[in-house]
Structure formats: structure tokens, C-alpha cells
A protein has these predicted regions:
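Conserved core of the sugar-phosphate nucleotidyltransferase
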Residues: 125-233
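Active-site acidic Asp-centered loop
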Residues: 118-120
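Short, well-formed alpha-helical segments that are part of the catalytic scaffolds
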Residues: 27-35, 45-64
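Structural motif
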Residues: 8-10, 116, 145, 179
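Hydrophobic/basic alpha-helical segments enriched in Actinobacteria
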Residues: 43-46, 224-225
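N-terminal nucleotide-binding beta1-loop-alpha1 segment
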Residues: 1-41
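Conserved N-terminal catalytic core of the sugar/cofactor nucleotidyltransferase
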Residues: 1-9, 13-17, 53-114, 127, ...
């Protein structure tokens, strides 16, 4: 088993050019035509630019600057190969569903004891933020998931649309980063699929965790510690 850290970045997804041009993304522009993907009318989300850099480029630069990753796997289309630095950065072909892309990425790094999972749409990510998250994750934890308090998120990103979980401890927003033990999650691939299918509904996610968790969530009695304990039971 490898001892260093692997990184998995899921970079799938497309957006219609018309939808992108009508959006209100600040200072955003389409990626170069050479990397537009399936014709001029469809753009690869990971290659959309904020300022002068593609979203994927921002994430990869931050990962590289940490000096922590022995291997980085990017799950996406062939057009992304241009942005990678082999041999330590490799491309895994994307699949049709986001959770299948996560599973494919974990399969590629299953010999590592820990893998950092990131999405490619993190325009404000920095090497320091990644390092602090990695350092905060207990080395023996099978899953660490990034969350932030609503007041901190709103102060940093005012007017940004997001979904908040209202818990007894406060309101929280989910991050786009996880530290995982690949083998442990791969053994529960079906559970990952169910979580992914319900990811847009906090109620359905709570139901997946059991009626007791759902009741506590509905009555605003659920705490972060309760979620952690239930996750330990499920994993």
C-alpha cells in the first residue's frame, strides 16, 4: 500500500453555450475554442474561465503548490489532457453520472490509504486552504467532509446561491472537498450511488440515514456530532 497522498478531481459535465452566456458568473468567460468540447454550442464546465485561468487550472495549480500529492487523477474528457502534467497527473475517462466518476477516480487510486477528493469548480481554492483541510482530517478517519458555517460562507461569498442544512449547532453549507480511504468507500459503492441520487435533497439524505436522524433534522435537534456518529455506523 502506498503511504503518500493521492488526489482525485472530478471534471466532467457540460454546459450549453447559450446557458453560459446568459448566466451571471462574475468575470467569467468561455474557455478557448480548442477546448470547447462537443462542438461550438457545448462547453466543458471545467474549462470555463474566471479571469484568465480555467477552473481546472486553478484547482490543479493549488494541488501542485501544496506539494502533498504523489499522484493526481483527473476524471473527465480527453480534451482535459492538455492541462495535465504527466506522469504524476493522469486522466481517467469520465462516465455519465457524477457519482460514477467519483467511483472511477477512487478505483484508480485504491492502493493509497488516503485520497483527497475535489471537484473542478473551485475558483477560489488555494494551496493553503487545501493544506489546512488535509491537516484537520484525522489520519485514521475513513471519511472527512468539508463544511462551513453559513455566516462564514455568506461573509466570504455574499449573495452566492447555496443550500444550507439547518442543524441545532447552526446552519451549514457543504464544501466540495473530502478526505477518504479509497478502499473503504469502494466497498460501499452502492451507498455512494444512493447518496449521489439524493444529494439535491437534504430530506432524502436524512431519510437515507434513518428515521431517527430524519426526525431530529425535521425538529432542528440534529447536531453535527449526530451526523458524524451515524456516518461512522454506516461506514
Amino acid at each position: 500500500m502506498r503511504t503518500n497522498l493521492a488526489v482525485v478531481v472530478t471534471a466532467g459535465g457540460r454546459i450549453a453555450r447559450a446557458d453560459f452566456l446568459s448566466s451571471s458568473l462574475p468575470e467569467a468567460s468561455a474557455a478557448a475554442e480548442d477546448y470547447a468540447g462537443e462542438g461550438r454550442h457545448v462547453l466543458i464546465k471545467a474549462l470555463l474561465k474566471t479571469g484568465r485561468r480555467a477552473l481546472l487550472e486553478i484547482v490543479l495549480d493549488a494541488v501542485r503548490a501544496t506539494g502533498l500529492a504523489e499522484r493526481t487523477v483527473i476524471v473527465g474528457s480527453a480534451e482535459l489532457q492538455h492541462w495535465l502534467n504527466p506522469p504524476h497527473e493522469t486522466l481517467v475517462p469520465e462516465l455519465s453520472e457524477a457519482h460514477e466518476n467519483l467511483i472511477a477516480g477512487l478505483e484508480a487510486v485504491k492502493e493509497y490509504p488516503r485520497a483527497l477528493y475535489l471537484t473542478s469548480d473551485l475558483p477560489f481554492v488555494t494551496a493553503d486552504a487545501i493544506k489546512r483541510f488535509v491537516d484537520a482530517c484525522p489520519p485514521d478517519a475513513q471519511l472527512c467532509y468539508a463544511i462551513a458555517r453559513r455566516e462564514a460562507f455568506d461573509a466570504r461569498f455574499p449573495d452566492s446561491p447555496s443550500t444550507y442544512a439547518r442543524l441545532r449547532d447552526g446552519e451549514f453549507v457543504a464544501g466540495c472537498a473530502m478526505m477518504v480511504e479509497p478502499a473503504a468507500l469502494l466497498a460501499r459503492a452502492e451507498w455512494i450511488r444512493q447518496v449521489a441520487q439524493r444529494r439535491k435533497s437534504l430530506w432524502r439524505l436524512a431519510l437515507l440515514a434513518g428515521w431517527h436522524v430524519l426526525w431530529k433534522y425535521a425538529t432542528r435537534q440534529l447536531r453535527v456530532a449526530d451526523v458524524e456518529r451515524r456516518a461512522e455506523q454506516l461506514l
